[in-house]
């Protein structure tokens, strides 16, 4: 009796892995053994960087708030401290957005916080 090797499932599995490696350079995109390692590593980087992205954006928001605060005669740390003392809760993302899109409104916030 001939050996059944379930070629349909094997081909589907290989296609699924090769599909994840679309756009990879050279043998990293078309040789299965190399593709497996490349896709594994890519998924590790993706997992790590989904978490790092949160930290990166927070630091970007802080930089933007600090730059806008310095234009208004204070610093980020003094402003955040004053906001916490007055229990004004505006998150960093929103503050950074206001600082970039509406500097006049940000100036009013700074004046209200630092009196």
From Swiss-Prot:
What is the protein named? Answer: Large ribosomal subunit protein bL20
Which CDD domains does the protein's record reference?
Ribosomal_L20
> Per UniProt, what is the name of the gene that codes for the protein in this document?
rplT
User: What cellular-component terms does GO give this entry?
Assistant: ribonucleoprotein complex; ribosome
InterPro entries this protein is in?
Ribosomal_bL20, RIBOSOMAL_L20_CS, Ribosomal_protein_bL20_C
Where along the sequence do coiled-coil regions lie?
A: none
What processes in GO biological process is this protein linked to? ribosomal large subunit assembly; translation
The UniProt entry, under Pfam families, shows: Ribosomal_L20
Function comment: Binds directly to 23S ribosomal RNA and is necessary for the in vitro assembly process of the 50S ribosomal subunit. It is not involved in the protein synthesizing functions of that subunit.
A GO MF annotation of the entry reads: rRNA binding
Q: Report the sequence similarity comment from the record.
A: Belongs to the bacterial ribosomal protein bL20 family.
Instruction: Give a yes or no for keyword Ribonucleoprotein in this entry.
Output: yes
Mind listing the UniProt keywords for this protein, alphabetically? Ribonucleoprotein, Ribosomal protein, RNA-binding, rRNA-binding
- From which domain of life does this come? Bacteria
């Amino acid at each position: 009796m001939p050996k059944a090797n379930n070629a349909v499932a094997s081909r589907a599995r290989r296609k699924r892995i090769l599909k994840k490696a679309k756009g990879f350079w050279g043998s990293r995109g078309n040789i299965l053994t190399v593709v497996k390692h490349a896709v594994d590593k890519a998924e590790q980087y993706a997992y790590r960087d989904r978490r790092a992205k949160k930290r990166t954006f927070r630091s970007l928001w802080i930089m933007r708030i600090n730059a806008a605060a310095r234009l208004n005669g204070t610093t980020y740390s003094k402003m955040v401290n004053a906001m916490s003392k007055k229990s004004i809760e505006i998150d960093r993302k929103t503050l950074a957005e206001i600082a970039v899109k509406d500097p006049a409104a940000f100036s009013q916030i700074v004046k209200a916080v630092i009196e």
